[in-house]
Structure formats: C-alpha cells, structure tokens
Amino acid sequence: MTQEKRSQWNYESVEEILEDIEDKGYEKIGLQGPDGIKPQIIDYAEQLEEKGYDTVIIGASSFGACGIADEKAERMDADALIHIGHTRFLHPEGQDMDDLNVYYLPYREDRDLMSVLEEHYDEIEEETLGLVGVTQYMDRAEEAREFLEEKGYEVVEGKTGLRTTEPGQVLGC
C-alpha cells in the first residue's frame, strides 16, 4: 500500500485518473459507487484491467461521498480507490474523509434537461431563480444559467464549500 496521502480531487474522466495512478505507480485499484451504476463500475474495472491494473470492486451499497469505502479498500491491499458517482466530500471541520488515495469520478446523467427548460421556462413567474442540482446534472448548470439569463431571469446559486465542490450543488445527506 502506498503511504503517500493524496489530496482529494474530482475528475471528469477515467483517463485523467489513469494518468495520475500511472505516475504514482499504483498497481491495485478499488472501485466503489452506488447500486444504480454498478454496470458502469464493472466497465471501468475492465478498462483498468486492460491497462494491467489489478482491480477490486467494493460491492457494498454506497449512498454518497460521505460513505467512502477506504477501510475496505485498504483491507484488500488497494493502492487507491476510485469513488464513482459523487464529488469530493469533507467533514464539516475540514478533515479528509479517508486515509487512502481517493479519486472522485462524478457520474453524469445523459438525460436532455435543456429541452424541458426551453419548453417550460415561460411558466416560471419569478424574476429571480435559484439554480441548484445534484452531482449527476451539475455539468449542465452553466448552460441552464446562460439560457435563463438570456430570457431575462436573474439567476443565483449557492457557493461551494467543504461539503460541495460545485456551485449550487445539493447533497442527499
């Protein structure tokens, strides 16, 4: 097990993570994520195995980044853990949630949200709107913001913090 403690970061592709784990010399990688995306986690494991890495999928249910399976990954001698589905999460006091090298790969849902917004925006009676969302849709927040501002709305959003890494992000925990 590599003893170096890594800062926690969000990545947008497994290729970005592969670059870093290759640079660090990691050999065994744990993968964790929520039940709804287990098939995708298996796909990621296969990608890693094709590159020569040993993988272990942690099959226990995961309900968010506040439930990192770092201890399970360590017991399985993993050098790092890829947590798929959520963004980085810290304790309110700012301490890291884990002692293992954790990579966060948010899962992005591919549903078309803009067509719904374009079709129904004129039903919104308020002039000032709060733009919020869950991790799976936050990659489209800027597009929604721009659209609404072009239509004359004032759009506000929450700030990032210890628990959220994207403006307007809402957590389930």
Question: What role is predicted for each listed range?
Answer:
Residues M1-C173:
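An N-terminal assembly and electron-transfer interface module characteristic of large anaerobic redox
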